[in-house]
Amino acid sequence: MKSKVLQRFVLCITASLLFWNLNIATHASTLTPCENSAQFQARLNNNIKKLENKLTYYKQNSQEYTSIKQQIEKTKIRFDKYAKSSLLCGEDGLPHLITDGDWQHSGEFFIPSVLFIYIAGWIGWAGKGYLQYSKTLTKPNENEIIIDLPRALKYMFSGFAWPILALKEFKNGSLLASNDEITTSPR
């Protein structure tokens, strides 16, 4: 049963990718690749200059001096990564996230947001399972305050498959509460 649900899910994703128009929108005329942006370079130079000015307050080879030198290198590396990526910068010299459906920019917004939803769902699914387990005990409130770590870890490790488990529970009707279990306030 799980394999059929998974096959249908993969089929839906594949079909939507095949029929998706990848040239949905053009980028705003004010955005330029960060490597070509003069404001981006000015922002890099200003950041480096501020850090180098801080160096004058400390003795060479002191802990603070070394820390600021490392921060300068990290800043250069960060700006270099931005310049080499497909990020586009605005008139302010800052990289902008493109969320228009263009797959060239999927790493900027789409992939991180899907990962966020997956991780949030994983945590929620594990918490739901643990709370349902707690309700079966004689002192459920105590088990919510003093967490049974081995049991909680069991739910946490099994939660990675939460999308498939949620579909399974939805199909058999145990995911949603029935209407008679939902209370309504008098009006």
Swiss-Prot record:
Disulfide bonds: none
Entry keyword annotation includes Transferase: no
InterPro entries per UniProt: PSI_PsaF, PSI_PsaF_sf
Chief localization: plastid
GO cellular component: chloroplast thylakoid membrane; photosystem I reaction center
Alphabetized Gene3D superfamilies for the sequence: Photosystem I PsaF, reaction centre subunit III (1.10.8.110)
Gene this protein is translated from: psaF
Transmembrane parts of this sequence: 107-127
UniProt membrane topology term: Single-pass membrane protein
Role of this protein: Probably participates in efficiency of electron transfer from plastocyanin to P700 (or cytochrome c553 in algae and cyanobacteria). This plastocyanin-docking protein contributes to the specific association of plastocyanin to PSI.
Subcellular location: Plastid, Chloroplast thylakoid membrane
Keywords: Chloroplast, Membrane, Photosynthesis, Photosystem I, Plastid, Signal, Thylakoid, Transmembrane, Transmembrane helix
Biological process terms in GO annotation: photosynthesis
Entry keyword Transmembrane: yes
Name this polypeptide is given: Photosystem I reaction center subunit III
Family statement: Belongs to the PsaF family.
